[in-house]
Amino acid sequence: MRDARDVLKRPVISEKSVGLIEENKYSFWVDTAANKIEIKAAVEKMFKVKVVDVRTINVDGKKKRVGKHVGRTADRKKAIVTLKAGDRIEGFAGL
């Protein structure tokens, strides 16, 4: 197993992800090679909570253009983690 800091990159802060916190669901950008088992273990280790469910989404990079040059942003992976009832992640409390 990889280190938890290598699996979880940063939390997703958006209007939709902040709304999911009320349902005890937290969103993170994760490593594109990470699987659900590694994501679950990383969240449980870093935040000392019990994970009930992990859902992942592969987000394709967007096409970007500067003048005549066309490029792409990097592909990313997002994980939505559902915690056991009563568990909370403290860093998200103020959102």
Curated annotation (Swiss-Prot):
One of its GO terms (biological process) is translation. Gene3D superfamilies: 3.30.70.330. SUPFAM superfamilies: Ribosomal proteins S24e, L23 and L15e. Signal peptide: none annotated. GO terms for molecular function: rRNA binding; structural constituent of ribosome. Keywords: Ribonucleoprotein, Ribosomal protein, RNA-binding, rRNA-binding. GO terms for cellular component: ribonucleoprotein complex; ribosome. InterPro entries: Nucleotide-bd_a/b_plait_sf, Ribosomal_uL23-like, Ribosomal_uL23/eL15/eS24_sf, Ribosomal_uL23_CS. Part of the 50S ribosomal subunit. Contacts protein L29, and trigger factor when it is bound to the ribosome. Belongs to the universal ribosomal protein uL23 family. One of the early assembly proteins it binds 23S rRNA. One of the proteins that surrounds the polypeptide exit tunnel on the outside of the ribosome. Forms the main docking site for trigger factor binding to the ribosome. PANTHER family: 60S RIBOSOMAL PROTEIN L23A. This is Large ribosomal subunit protein uL23.
